[in-house]
């Protein structure tokens, strides 16, 4: 059973320069958090949006609700806000973490996030 879905707002399809270089990095922070949570008995799923699409993530959010954790940074702010809106449409509880949301918690809470980890 999945207690928590973790993702981030970076979609390689949206980054023309990175597509030319093609050296994206794995979401090590999300993977580390996932591993730690699993050792404590939580069911965790990681959706790596790097090679995914907004449509795939939206389909996953439509498939069932729960708790969604999203890593935030300045570059992914527009995508994260769209993810928050989509998740809330499908009754997910949204937890945000990372440098962007930690520096602007009020803005992210106003946009629909339930929790911002600082």
Question: Where does each model-flagged region fall?
Answer:
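Glycine- and acidic-residue-enriched helix-capping/strand-helix junction motifs
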Residues: 15-30
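Extreme N-terminal starter segment of soluble prokaryotic enzymes
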Residues: 1-5
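Short beta-strand segments
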Residues: 7-8, 71
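Short polar catalytic/cofactor-binding loops
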Residues: 8-14
């Amino acid at each position: 059973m999945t207690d928590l879905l973790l993702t981030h707002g970076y979609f390689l399809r949206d980054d023309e320069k990175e597509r030319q270089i093609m050296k994206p990095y794995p979401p090590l922070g999300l993977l580390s958090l996932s591993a730690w949570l699993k050792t404590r008995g939580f069911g965790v799923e990681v959706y790596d949006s790097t090679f995914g699409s907004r449509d795939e993530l939206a389909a996953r959010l439509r498939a069932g609700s729960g708790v969604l954790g999203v890593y935030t940074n300045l570059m992914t702010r527009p995508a994260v806000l769209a993810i928050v809106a989509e998740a809330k449409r499908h009754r997910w509880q949204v937890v945000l973490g990372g440098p962007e949301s930690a520096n602007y918690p009020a803005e992210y809470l106003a946009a629909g996030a339930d929790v911002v980890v600082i």
